[in-house]
């Protein structure tokens, strides 16, 4: 059982894997029909990951909650051995239909699975990517621990999530009293502060290497579209300084090798 905020109050909703999966299948189909480009590789969170991921040829990369597979295809075109995992069969069906014509250097694998219980062996991947996903999971800590488990020692995590402590986040909190709380009508949504997420990342055993942010938006009046200052996203130094105001937060972390973890545990 999970509690969500909807409208002006709390509403209790009972979820199990099948009911939530069914809702996400419907959501993906509706979003795809309304906007086929939704969540494509030009989304700001994928742009952040692309900026930091570095050379990936030959690397084993997992994208958790890959959706319709746009970023999976981009990574595979760059020479990575990519696995995409998503909870929704509808999203994976859409992803599979686009793979044959994608011109991939290496085949990509698509697997249905739960981000909170990843169906992969330990130490399977060099890099794990998760974009705008953990805020839609009932158990975020289990998901972060699972991403750590399937990453090899020395491997990296690149993760993005909305920043609810900025101007737009405050505006969204205000809007809770006027509209349902779900972002894009997603079936499940939790608003968590980035410092808490960083704490969970560290507790799972990751070493944080870098944080950043993107999409600086400033609401003017309720009901009006916010102004986005794209110039603030173009320079990394400026973006870093203003990251507390960003709409999307980014963290890159590394799984400690076993020797380093053993020394740390002995202290």
Predicted regions mapped to residue ranges:
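Acidic/polar helix N-cap motif
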Residues: 114-117, 121-122, 139
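Conserved N-terminal segment of class I S-adenosyl-L-methionine
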Residues: 2-117, 127-131, 144, 213, ...
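Intrinsic disorder/low-complexity segments
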Residues: 260-263, 267
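Short catalytic micro-motifs in class I SAM-dependent methyltransferases
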Residues: 132-136
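S-adenosyl-L-methionine-dependent methyltransferase catalytic module, highlighting the catalytic core
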Residues: 27, 34-43, 91-94, 138-146, ...
